[in-house]
């Protein structure tokens, strides 16, 4: 499974959104994700990919998060 698909699944599970709503271009603001949601998503991604996500990194879209994971796993 590709990184995007795993990240998409985590976001869908955490936010209760439909898969079609979570694309690479989707911003976390569009998904109505608050800071607690983002914390949980990042925590799940760290567990799934065995990476440490820099919370200071500027990640506004799903693509930003996917690129970060791909570059740091």
Curated annotation (Swiss-Prot):
Report the InterPro entries cross-referenced here: ACP, ACP-like_sf, PP-bd_ACP
Cellular component, GO, one term: cytoplasm
Keywords of this entry: Cytoplasm, Fatty acid biosynthesis, Fatty acid metabolism, Lipid biosynthesis, Lipid metabolism, Phosphopantetheine, Phosphoprotein
Domain of life, source organism:
Bacteria
Disulfide bridge map? none
Location of O-(pantetheine 4'-phosphoryl)serine modifications: 35
User: Boundaries of each Carrier domain copy?
Assistant: 1-73
Q: Name one Pfam family in it.
A: PP-binding
Q: Where in the cell is it found?
A: Cytoplasm
PROSITE patterns named among the record's database cross-references: CARRIER
Kindly tell me the pathway this chain contributes to.
Lipid metabolism; fatty acid biosynthesis
Major localisation: cytoplasm
**Record carries keyword Lipid biosynthesis:** yes
Function description: Carrier of the growing fatty acid chain in fatty acid biosynthesis.
Q: Which HAMAP family match?
A: Acyl_carrier
Its family remark reads: Belongs to the acyl carrier protein (ACP) family.
In its UniProt entry, what is this protein called?
Acyl carrier protein
What gene is this protein a product of?
Answer: acpP
């Amino acid at each position: 499974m590709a990184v995007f698909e795993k990240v998409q699944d985590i976001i869908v599970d955490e936010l209760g959104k439909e898969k079609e709503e979570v694309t690479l271009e989707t911003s976390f603001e569009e998904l109505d994700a608050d800071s607690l949601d983002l914390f949980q998503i990042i925590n799940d991604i760290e567990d799934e990919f065995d990476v440490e996500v820099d919370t200071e990194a500027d990640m506004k879209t799903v693509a930003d998060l996917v690129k970060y994971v791909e570059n740091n796993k």
